From Swiss-Prot:
Its main location: membrane. This is UDP-N-acetylglucosamine--N-acetylmuramyl-(pentapeptide) pyrophosphoryl-undecaprenol N-acetylglucosamine transferase. The gene is murG. Cell wall formation. Catalyzes the transfer of a GlcNAc subunit on undecaprenyl-pyrophosphoryl-MurNAc-pentapeptide (lipid intermediate I) to form undecaprenyl-pyrophosphoryl-MurNAc-(pentapeptide)GlcNAc (lipid intermediate II). The keyword Mitochondrion does not apply. GO terms for biological process: carbohydrate metabolic process; cell division; cell wall organization; lipid glycosylation; peptidoglycan biosynthetic process; regulation of cell shape. The keyword rRNA processing does not apply. Pfam families: Glyco_tran_28_C (PF04101), Glyco_transf_28 (PF03033). GO terms for molecular function: UDP-N-acetyl-D-glucosamine:N-acetylmuramoyl-L-alanyl-D-glutamyl-meso-2,6-diaminopimelyl-D-alanyl-D-alanine-diphosphoundecaprenol 4-beta-N-acetylglucosaminlytransferase activity; undecaprenyldiphospho-muramoylpentapeptide beta-N-acetylglucosaminyltransferase activity. It comes from the Bacteria. Keywords: Cell cycle, Cell division, Cell inner membrane, Cell membrane, Cell shape, Cell wall biogenesis/degradation, Glycosyltransferase, Membrane, Peptidoglycan synthesis, Transferase. PANTHER family: GLYCOSYLTRANSFERASE, UDP-N-ACETYLGLUCOSAMINE--N-ACETYLMURAMYL-(PENTAPEPTIDE) PYROPHOSPHORYL-UNDECAPRENOL N-ACETYLGLUCOSAMINE TRANSFERASE 1. HAMAP family: MurG. Pathway: Cell wall biogenesis; peptidoglycan biosynthesis.
Amino acid sequence: MGPQTGKRLLVMAGGTGGHVFPALAVARRLASEGWQIRWLGTADRMEARLVPQHGFDIDFIDIQGVRGNGLLRKLAAPFKVLRSVMQARKVIREFKPDVVLGMGGFASGPGGVAAKLCGIPLVLHEQNAIPGMTNKLLSRIATRVLCAFEGAFGSLGTTVGNPIREELVALGAKPRESRTEALKVLVVGGSLGAKVFNDLMPSVTARIAQLQPVTVWHQTGKNNLSTVQAEYQLQGQDGGVKIAEFIDDMEAAYRWADVVLCRAGALTVSELAAVGLPSILVPYPHAVDDHQTMNARVLVDAGAAFLVPQPIATTELLADKLQLLAGDRDELTRMGERARAAAVLDATERVAEVCRELAK
C-alpha cells in the first residue's frame, strides 16, 4: 500500500520498555510515510520521557493499575477508570485519529474504551506469550487483535511478531566474527537490575576463570553498580569485567556478546532472536501469570537458549551452562543460528500494514 500522507495514529503504550519500544518502531515507520503520530500515556511512567525524546507529542491521562492492590483501591477503581476514559475521549476528539494502536500499559485500557466509544478502529498488539489483563478485556471490543507469539489469543489473534528496531534486524543479518577468544558474556538485568545476576555473577565469573578465559559486560541496574563492582573485586575478577548501571547502546552490546544472560521479557526474547544470540534465560519469577517463562519457551524450544528457573539458579549451575558453551563454540554458533531462525523480522511492517488497512 502506498503512502497515506495526513493519516493520524494515536499510540497507547507505556510503563515499560517492552511496551514503549515496539510501539516506537511502528510509530517511526508510519511517521516516515507522512502519518501524524500522537501518544497517550501516563505522566509518571517511562513514556513521559522516552516518547518526546523520539520526537512525538504525548498526552497524559490519570490511571493506575488495580491488579493485586488493596480492597479500598479496588472499590475506587471504577470511578478512576471512568474519569480516565473521559480524559482519553477528549484527546481522541481533539486529535481525530484514523486508527488507535494499543500496545500495553495503564493508558491502553481507558484509551481503548474511548476509541470504541468514538467509533475509531482499535488495533491491539500483545507482546507477551500470555496476554495482560488489559488486552484480554480490550480484545472483546478491538477491531484487530495482533500478538507476538502464536496462541496468545487463541483463534482470535493474528501472529505478527514483536516490532523491534531496524538496527537490530540489520545486525542479525551480518555474519558474526569467529568465536575463538575468551567467552564474552553479556549480563542484562533491566533498568532496576536483577538481584539474582548481581548476587551470583561475580562468583560465576571466578569459577569459570579457573578453567578458561571469560570476559563479562554486566548491566547492574540503578544504584547497584558500586556493590556489584566491589563483589567482582573481592572475587579477583574486576580486570576482565565491564560494569555499568545502564547500557545505552544495546546494538553495540549485542554485537560484542557471544552469549546473553538475562530475564525473558517479550522484547528481550524478540531482540535475542533478531540478532541471533544464544542465551541463558532466568525468567522473573513474580511476573503476572508467569508470562516470562512462556516467553522463554520460544527460544528454549528452538534450541537457542537454556532455561534456568530462578529458584534453582546457583553459582554452580550458571557456571556449568556457560562453561558448556565456552567449550563448544560450534554449538554456540548453532544456537545463534536457531535463534535467528525463530525471529519474526518483519513485525514492524505487519503491524503498520494493519493500521494502513484500517485507515483507508
